[in-house]
From Swiss-Prot:
Keyword entries, A-Z: Cell membrane, Disulfide bond, Heme biosynthesis, Iron, Membrane, Metal-binding, Oxidoreductase, Transmembrane, Transmembrane helix
Gene: ctaA
Residues spanning the membrane: 7-27, 63-83, 91-111, 122-142, 161-181, 202-222, 237-257, 263-283
Lineage top rank: taxon: Bacteria
Family: Belongs to the COX15/CtaA family. Type 1 subfamily.
Subcellular location: Cell membrane
Recorded metabolic or biological pathway in which this protein acts: Porphyrin-containing compound metabolism; heme A biosynthesis; heme A from heme O: step 1/1
Catalytic-site annotation from UniProt: E58
Name of this chain's protein: Heme A synthase
Function as written in the Swiss-Prot or TrEMBL entry: Catalyzes the conversion of heme O to heme A by two successive hydroxylations of the methyl group at C8. The first hydroxylation forms heme I, the second hydroxylation results in an unstable dihydroxymethyl group, which spontaneously dehydrates, resulting in the formyl group of heme A.
Organism phylogeny: Bacteria, Bacillati, Bacillota, Bacilli, Bacillales
Length: 297
């Protein structure tokens, strides 16, 4: 294990989490136009003068994202040199970089061209994929040299994990869409909307709740399957996933029933990020143990 590289990779993964939470702050405070329609400048300036609160939030998000982007590039180059014979590490380093780049392009496009809500809802999901790639990359770097995984994931559980990963992205997209169309408080009551008439925003909110509820029960089923099949890694990972998704549902209800403070939606975003990271690793672990050779070469 390359100790210095492991520490650096873990640090970069942490900074990517910060980027995600700062992006959530931009959305929650409606600060996306805090720098006007200029990018990468802010109101035509490299450093804004007399900035408003919204400008400070948007500008700091851009600045941190730029720094983290450079850190990811440095991490990719370092891993390419340190692990010349590891295709799996190269792939996740590339994924972390490319999705960070796509996220930045989508964010810039939103400022310059005022993208639709359908497009902007992709932004958070793209960032999640970059974060998950960094997390898996860090775990791979930290593994002992020559370590093998002989505990193959049963085919049924493996397929469940693949499906859970894909379905999670769908639910994440609907959650981001709820925020971007301003539907967070469109429903009165929880878990169902109790108002007599349903607006478009209320339907968007209700559909997300239904899909999120199904994700919760899907997670419980996968956890139960991992326990029944006695697969240690999946069982432990799904225990964490179940904890995160349970807290996620609770914070979702909290937001609707009175959690108007900025930190509540940020906690909601933090929990789904942790959940997605766990599920992503478990899905990849299932993928690489499908054959005797535990690594991509």
């Amino acid at each position: 294990m390359n100790r210095k590289l492991s520490i650096f990779s873990a640090f970069v993964t942490f900074t990517m989490m910060i980027v995600l939470l700062m992006g959530g702050t931009v959305t929650k405070t409606d600060s996306g136009n805090g720098c006007g329609t200029d990018w990468p400048l802010c109101h035509g300036e490299l450093i804004p003068t007399n900035p408003s609160v919204e400008t400070m939030i948007e500008y700091s998000h851009r600045a941190v994202t730029g720094v983290v982007g450079l850190l990811i590039i440095a991490l990719c180059l370092w891993t390419l040199v340190a692990f010349k014979d590891r295709l799996d590490i190269k792939i996740f380093a590339f994924l972390a970089f490319i999705f960070m780049l796509i996220q930045s392009i989508v964010g810039a496009g939103a400022v310059v061209w005022q993208q639709s809500d359908l497009v902007m809802a992709l932004h958070f999901g793209i960032s999640l994929i970059s974060f998950a790639s960094l997390l898996i990359l860090t775990i791979l770097i930290m593994e002992r040299s020559g370590q093998e995984f002989r505990e193959s994931v049963p085919a049924f559980l493996r397929k469940l994990l693949y499906g859970l990963l894909i379905y999670t992205l769908i639910v994440v997209y609907t959650g981001a869409f709820v925020r971007h169309v301003g539907a967070t408080y469109a429903c009165v009551g929880w878990p169902v909307c109790s108002q007599p008439t349903m607006t478009f925003e209320a339907w968007v909110q209700m559909i997300h709740r239904i899909l999120a509820g199904l994700l919760f029960f899907y997670t419980l089923f996968v956890h139960y399957t991992a326990i029944r099949l006695k697969h240690r890694t999946s069982r432990t990972g799904m225990l964490f996933a179940t904890f995160f998704i349970s807290c996620q549902v609770a914070t979702g209800a909290w937001i609707v029933l009175g959690g108007h403070a900025t930190y509540v939606p940020l906690l909601h975003a933090f929990l789904i990020t942790c959940y997605f990271g766990v599920i992503s690793y478990l899905a990849y672990h299932a993928f690489r143990t499908r054959k005797k050779d535990s690594r991509l070469r």
